[in-house]
């Protein structure tokens, strides 16, 4: 068998390509039609072409190398995307939460604290076996849902801050002179201020009934409504200060006004004080028909009372209730009656005439002066609420105040009926947190008056929903200077704040000024206001000057 070889088979031929010669440069002379109008983009062979998508891992571990897949040349802008707002494509979407079926509820609940989306006991997840866990108390403290711990750090937002209203509306014709922020006021100090010297003493005091020291939660006593007149006369309306201003001092005020200024760094609510400069004399006044004399409730609390005027637990209604309780308590704990002994000062009550037959509250007035340096002499009217007879026969003057419990659940406080007898310190500490400004002002008033004791009463509602009936659950007494140290109240700083404001006003021209605490910022502002501002007889354009505040009561003669 033989094989036949076909020699006529054709082999593939090689055609020599045509090489174009470019005399003017390099590269081809003509561009093929398939590559016309195609933009050129520089590239590098080392550039990564893409990234593998991992749909199971939601965490990003490439934060340090976010440009890992970018071009090395930084070019190619012709392919970049630029966002332009297109209103034609705008449409609303339904944001309502879709109810999950029962089998999917709580499916990923245990994956919050695990890294990279793994479970607690999965591979690479968080293993809780053999680990020390936090106690329930610590978990509550660290949980952002409870308002503490690291809630704000991780974006957990709380309720929006409440915008408080100003105590007086700032008008266009008022000129702002100075702004004093609290951090700067806290650093002020005026040490070595001696005790005030008595100039005039007026009024009559009743003796304290020691049986109220034995009151406790199990032996409570109802709070009585005592019909007595309490005078809260401002500085320029005081006849004694008018008389003393001709011979003694160059700065005049009352203890309530001084305490408000000295404790201004602890206040949250807005307040204002009118100052008149006449020559080298300065008079500090409160405006008529304002809420200056009302006692605030839970002013410094983390959750202050809600602004609902229809509720008995609104800030204004609670302030009226606290003032009512304070006035009645300070008179009930005294020995009243015509046969009971009384302590009389040198002069009678300056706010009542001899022919008036009215029952006045037990109040003793001390007009004292202080040397503040730089020829500044302060004259102020201070008050005592009662007197205590000591075994040695010497009288001890008292400042009597009352703390009130309205609703411990709404106030986020301590229930007095459970803790007052056994843990009184915890109750007082809670009150110091919620009413820091009010307690500080009471302490300053007691120190200015030279009281030997500061008597605090604990008064609570019989029913949390009834704000008209109250009971006395206990009393507690302190020495004013020791209590000031206990609540971290520096009298040197208080005098420094007062001296700073006095020096600022002394540099101004004669006229009327107003100090106001900003309702929402820790700032005190000094305004230059027209001389006829807040005058009751000013009725230009039929528009009263007292538009900025709401008339509450005439506290010049207020019955309780």
UniProtKB/Swiss-Prot annotation:
- Please name every pair of cysteines joined by a disulfide bond in this record: none
Which keywords does this chain's UniProt record carry?
Answer: Cytoplasm, Initiation factor, Phosphoprotein, Protein biosynthesis, RNA-binding
Q: Which GO terms describe its molecular function?
A: mRNA cap binding; translation initiation factor activity
Query: Would you name any one GO CC term?
Result: nucleus
Query: Where is the protein found, in the record's own terms?
Result: Cytoplasm
Q: What is its main location?
A: cytoplasm
Under the heading Pfam families, the entry gives: eIF-3_zeta
Q: Where is this region: Disordered?
A: 98-166
Note down the stretches annotated as region RNA gate. Answer: 291-305
> Which residue windows does the record flag with biased composition (Basic residues)?
100-121, 147-156
Any single biological process term in GO: cap-dependent translational initiation
Q: What does this protein do?
A: mRNA cap-binding component of the eukaryotic translation initiation factor 3 (eIF-3) complex, which is involved in protein synthesis of a specialized repertoire of mRNAs and, together with other initiation factors, stimulates binding of mRNA and methionyl-tRNAi to the 40S ribosome. The eIF-3 complex specifically targets and initiates translation of a subset of mRNAs involved in cell proliferation. In the eIF-3 complex, eif3d specifically recognizes and binds the 7-methylguanosine cap of a subset of mRNAs.
> What is the protein's quaternary organization?
Component of the eukaryotic translation initiation factor 3 (eIF-3) complex. The eIF-3 complex interacts with pix.
UniProt similarity note: Belongs to the eIF-3 subunit D family.
About its domains, the entry says: The RNA gate region regulates mRNA cap recognition to prevent promiscuous mRNA-binding before assembly of eif3d into the full eukaryotic translation initiation factor 3 (eIF-3) complex.
Record's protein name: Eukaryotic translation initiation factor 3 subunit D-1
| Organism per entry | Drosophila simulans
The gene is eIF3d1
């Amino acid at each position: 068998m033989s094989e036949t070889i076909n020699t006529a088979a054709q082999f593939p031929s090689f055609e020599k390509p045509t090489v174009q010669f470019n005399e003017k440069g390099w590269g081809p002379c003509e561009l093929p039609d398939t590559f016309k109008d195609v933009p050129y983009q520089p590239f590098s062979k080392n550039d990564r072409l893409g990234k593998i998508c991992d749909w199971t891992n939601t965490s990003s571990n490439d934060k340090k190398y976010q440009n890992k897949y970018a071009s090395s040349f930084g070019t190619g802008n012709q392919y970049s995307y630029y966002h332009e707002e297109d209103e034609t494509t705008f449409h609303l979407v339904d944001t309502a939460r879709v109810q999950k079926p029962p089998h999917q509820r709580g499916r990923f609940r245990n994956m919050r604290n695990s890294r990279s989306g793994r479970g607690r006991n999965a591979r690479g997840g968080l293993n809780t076996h053999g680990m020390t866990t936090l106690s329930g108390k610590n978990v509550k403290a660290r949980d952002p849902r409870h308002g503490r711990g690291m809630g704000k750090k991780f974006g957990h937002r709380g309720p929006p801050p409440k915008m408080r209203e100003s105590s007086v509306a700032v008008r266009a014709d008022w000129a702002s002179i100075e702004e004093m922020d609290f951090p700067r006021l806290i650093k002020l100090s005026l040490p070595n201020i001696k005790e005030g010297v008595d100039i005039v003493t007026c009024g009559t005091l009743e003796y304290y009934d020691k049986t109220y020291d034995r009151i406790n939660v199990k032996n409570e006593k109802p709070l009585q409504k005592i019909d007595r007149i309490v005078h809260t006369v401002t500085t320029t309306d005081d006849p004694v200060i008018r008389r003393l201003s001709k011979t003694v001092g160059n700065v005049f005020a009352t203890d309530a006004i001084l305490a408000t200024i000295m404790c201004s760094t602890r206040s949250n609510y807005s307040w204002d004080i009118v100052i008149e400069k006449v020559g080298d004399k300065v008079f500090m006044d409160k405006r008529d028909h304002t809420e200056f004399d009302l006692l605030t409730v839970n002013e410094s609390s983390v959750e202050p009372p809600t602004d609902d005027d229809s509720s008995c637990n609104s800030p204004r209604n609670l302030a009226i209730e606290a003032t009512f309780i304070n006035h009645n308590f300070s008179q009930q704990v005294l020995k009243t009656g015509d046969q009971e002994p009384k302590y009389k000062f040198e002069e009678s009550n300056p706010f009542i005439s001899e022919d008036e037959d009215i029952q006045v509250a037990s109040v003793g007035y001390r007009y004292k002066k202080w040397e503040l340096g730089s020829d500044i002499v302060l004259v102020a009217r201070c008050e005592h609420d009662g007197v205590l007879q000591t075994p040695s026969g010497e009288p001890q003057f008292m400042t009597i105040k009352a703390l009130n419990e309205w609703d411990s659940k709404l106030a986020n406080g301590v229930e007095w009926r459970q803790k007052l007898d056994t843990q009184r310190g915890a109750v007082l500490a809670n009150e110091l947190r919620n009413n820091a400004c009010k307690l500080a002002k009471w302490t300053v008033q007691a120190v200015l008056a030279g009281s030997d004791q500061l008597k605090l009463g604990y008064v609570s509602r019989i029913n949390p929903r009834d704000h008209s009936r109250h009971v006395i659950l206990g009393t507690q007494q302190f020495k004013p200077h020791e209590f000031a140290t206990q609540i971290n109240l520096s009298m040197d700083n208080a005098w420094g704040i007062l001296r700073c404001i006095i020096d600022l006003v002394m540099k101004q021209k004669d006229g009327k000024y107003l100090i106001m605490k900003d309702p929402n910022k820790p700032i005190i502002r000094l305004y230059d206001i027209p001389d006829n501002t807040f005058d009751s007889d000013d009725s230009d354009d039929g528009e009263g000057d007292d538009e900025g505040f709401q008339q509450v009561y005439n506290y010049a003669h207020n019955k309780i």
